[in-house]
From Swiss-Prot:
Its EC number is 6.1.1.21. Pfam families: HGTP_anticodon, tRNA-synt_His. Homodimer. It comes from Burkholderia thailandensis (strain ATCC 700388 / DSM 13276 / CCUG 48851 / CIP 106301 / E264). This is Histidine--tRNA ligase.
Length: 446
């Protein structure tokens, strides 16, 4: 068999990095439109950072002994200049880097939001992918518990806007650095007493990041973790006042919550408030949004000491919930599908289609698949399949008479039959279609 005749191997996407196909894109667009409207209502501004950042941004910002930095980052050396680069595994550090680099905080606090793909090298499973998408907010320059409460309440409002139920809020306080240090000493002492019962992961974290042992999912360690010293018992007056202030605001705004003393988060930059929104509808991957306060991070990345808080949520997980609860909106078709037969009709169809688009109507103009003109019957099948509200038809008679034939494709008339085809002068076509679209929408509301 010659090289030319040998069948080429079919190329596929990278495992854990998924295509978003047209039949799924409508749900993504619905979520994105909903969340963007919400963020505008809270005065947040969009920021877009590169997918690739210098690796030290994450090792310094997230923490060298976190799972993300140790095991999950896609890092490489740039062949052009030898720089160590990484596909972003999260976006808080990148937003902070941008705020520092562009001196964004010189005139006061900023409310920022982002949306886009993140990358982590881990085993793909439901709700956890190697390329995944997050939307997140960063409130930079706000020190009080009121900012914490506001970003938590934003999530609550989003669940309501989407129609989601059964997502529960868990909160905790990680206190200040000196309080965590005192707790760390006692926690290590306690875990050392049970060292023979710890699994490999807990053994590895015992002296590098013992707080993360409290977050273990291993059933065999749950009793040990349950009886471990609680960080909340080491909080000083400032930390307690902050945490109590958050709780008062949440209660005043009817936001139910549970205090979870084991909630520690997987990133080293957090202090004081941490929170997660969790559900039992996604199996082991139950966290759909998480965040908290990260006051040390801006100084840690080279900026002036600045308070900050934020959250991120996994879009794929939220879309899974929308499907689980049958909240997927019906995708609407275009307004008009233009059908034509003959060269003169095709020219007229092009002109009219552009004119209709000028008025804001969504229009598909039939184009042949094989370069030859398709039959009227096959074009009408395509028009029906497109989900369009109306077919606008041009043939020899229509071109000669300066008209278009308009056929409704959705619904039925008052007699239960499909609405009849009408001949409309071309100069009146736009007005006719707009009025017909309004009438169709009103009928649908009845």
């Amino acid at each position: 068999m010659t090289e030319q005749k040998r069948k080429l191997e079919k190329l596929t996407g990278v495992k854990g990095m998924n295509d978003i196909l047209p039949q799924d894109a409508g749900l993504w667009e619905f979520f994105e439109a909903t969340v963007k409207s919400l963020l505008r209502a809270y005065g947040y501004q969009n920021i877009r950072t590169p997918i690739v950042e210098h690796t030290p941004l994450f090792t310094r910002g997230i923490g060298e002994v976190t799972d993300i930095v140790e095991k999950e980052m896609y890092s490489f050396v740039d062949a052009l200049n030898g720089e160590n680069l990484t596909l972003r595994p999260e976006n808080t550090a990148a937003v902070v880097r941008a705020a520092i680099e562009h001196n964004m905080l010189y005139d006061g606090p900023k409310r920022l939001w982002y949306i886009g793909p993140m990358f982590r090298h881990e085993r793909p499973q439901r709700g956890r992918y190697r390329q995944f998408h997050q939307v997140g907010v960063e409130a930079l320059g706000f020190a009080g518990p009121d900012a914490d409460a506001e970003i938590v309440m934003m999530c609550q409002r989003l669940w309501e806007d989407l129609g989601l139920t059964g997502i529960k809020l868990e909160i905790n306080s990680l206190g200040l650095a000196e309080e965590r240090a005192a707790h760390r000493v006692e926690l290590i002492k306690y875990l050392e007493q049970h060292a023979d019962k710890l699994d490999d992961d807990a053994q590895r974290r015992l002296y590098t990041n013992p707080l993360r042992v409290l977050d273990t999912k291993n059933p065999a360690l749950q009793e040990i973790v349950r009886n471990a010293p609680k960080l909340i018992d080491f909080l000083g007056d400032v930390s307690r006042a902050h945490f109590e202030g958050l709780q008062r605001l949440l209660k005043a705004n009817n936001v139910p919550f549970t205090i979870n003393p084991r909630l520690v988060r997987g990133l080293d930059y957090y202090n004081l408030t941490v929170f997660e929104w969790v559900t039992d509808k996604l199996g082991a991957q139950g966290t759909v949004a998480a965040g908290g306060r990260y006051d040390p991070l801006i100084e840690q990345l080279g900026g002036k000491p600045t308070a900050a808080c934020g959250w991120a949520m996994g879009i794929e997980r939220i879309l899974e919930l929308l499907k689980e609860e049958h909240l997927v909106p019906e995708q609407e078709g275009v307004d008009v599908y233009v059908v034509h037969q003959g060269d003169a009709a095709r020219e007229q169809a092009f002109i009219v289609a552009e004119r209709l688009r000028d008025t804001g109507l969504d229009v598909i103009l039939h184009c042949s698949a094989d370069g030859a003109g398709a039959s009227f019957k096959s074009q009408m099948k395509r028009a029906d399949a497109s989900g369009a509200a109306f077919a606008v038809i041009f043939g020899e008679d229509e071109v000669t008479n300066g008209t278009a034939s308009v056929k409704p494709l959705r619904g039925t008339g008052d007699d239960g039959e499909k609405s009849v085809q009408q001949s409309v002068p071309v100069e009146s076509l736009t007005e006719f279609l707009i009025n017909a679209m309004v009438a169709t929408a009103e009928d649908g509301d009845d």
